[in-house]
Amino acid sequence: MSDLDEIRRRRMEQLKQQQLAAQQQQGASLEQMQQEEQARQQFENQKKNALRQILTPEARQRLANLRLTKAELVNAIEMQLIQMAQAKRLQIPVTDATLKQILRETTSNKREIHITRK
């Protein structure tokens, strides 16, 4: 019986160590996820503040409306606007009309297909 008890005790210790190692690993990955989330939030806040300085309220509203249907396009345009403003290639503040022109230029690269029936 003592041999059996000794085997059980060793196995219990081994399981506890494995569980402790797994918990430590989860804690590290949780910390990493929290840091990544915090960095993402900080980036979003910086982007939001930059756009607040670059765009007029009407232009910001247009981007917000467009984001509902084409979020990836809006993100790309926002980054483009920030880069252009930093390079001083953009007259600040960007009005709604200027934003419309930028949107037309970036989306006009698509092909137009015309079908004629005879």
Swiss-Prot record:
Residues 15-44 have a biased composition (Low complexity). Keywords: DNA-binding. Pfam families: dsDNA_bind. Residues 15-45 are annotated as: Disordered. It comes from the Archaea. The keyword DNA-binding applies. SUPFAM superfamilies: Double-stranded DNA-binding domain. Belongs to the PDCD5 family. This is DNA-binding protein Msp_0595. It comes from Methanosphaera stadtmanae (strain ATCC 43021 / DSM 3091 / JCM 11832 / MCB-3).
